[in-house]
Amino acid sequence: GVQIADDLQLTHAQKGFMVATPVLAGALLRFVMGLLVDHLKPKKAGAIGQVIVIVALFVAWRLGIHSYEQALVLGLFLGVAGAAFAAALPLASRWYPPEHQGTAMGIAGAGNSGTALAALIAPSLAIAYGWTNVFGLALIPLVAVLVLYMLLARDAPECPAPKTLTQYLAV
């Protein structure tokens, strides 16, 4: 945070908005991810979300972030990670009977702990390697998780039939 703010010469308001952007984007993009989950099934929608985040971090790492606006754009793409929660819940809960869905969703929700761990670890990594290299380092666990996800995650055998956009708008 501090290194980014210094390098980009951000005001306090810009720092606050930069930090809030992924959270706000994630909240808004959950609707879009929910549509993808219902139309493509949870596994495919979750994979698309993960690939979007990985590509965004790779581009930020290789090309760098040189302005406040670029930081906000990256924040929008990182918001997709938060939106992916809309894929995790049905992916987990549809496998279990109602009496076990709370536990399944609680375990799936623990996946959000990666954001907290990143917030704890990233500042130390930024000091040691430079803040733009943190984007590259973040790719290591993200790609590993994507590989495991693709190998191990399965859509439940009984998923609701996909709906058209017109059917959603009729609600």
Question: How would you describe each model-predicted region?
Answer:
Residues 1-27, 68-69:
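Extracellular/periplasmic helix-loop-helix junction of adjacent transmembrane segments
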Residues 4-5, 36-37, 124-129:
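Interfacial helix-cap and linker-helix signal at transmembrane-aqueous boundaries
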Residues 23-31, 83, 115-117:
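Residue-level signature of mid-helix packing/kink "hotspots" within the transmembrane helices
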Residues 28-68:
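Conserved MFS/SLC helix-loop-helix module at the cytosolic interface between two early adjacent transmembrane helices
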Residues 50, 54-58, 74-75, 139-146:
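A generic transmembrane-helix signature of 12-TM secondary carrier transporters
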Residues 74-111:
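Cytoplasmic helix-loop-helix junction between adjacent transmembrane helices
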Residues 107-157:
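Helix-loop-helix hairpin linking two adjacent transmembrane segments in secondary transporters
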Residues 151-171:
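Flexible cytoplasmic inter-helical loops of multi-pass small-molecule transporters
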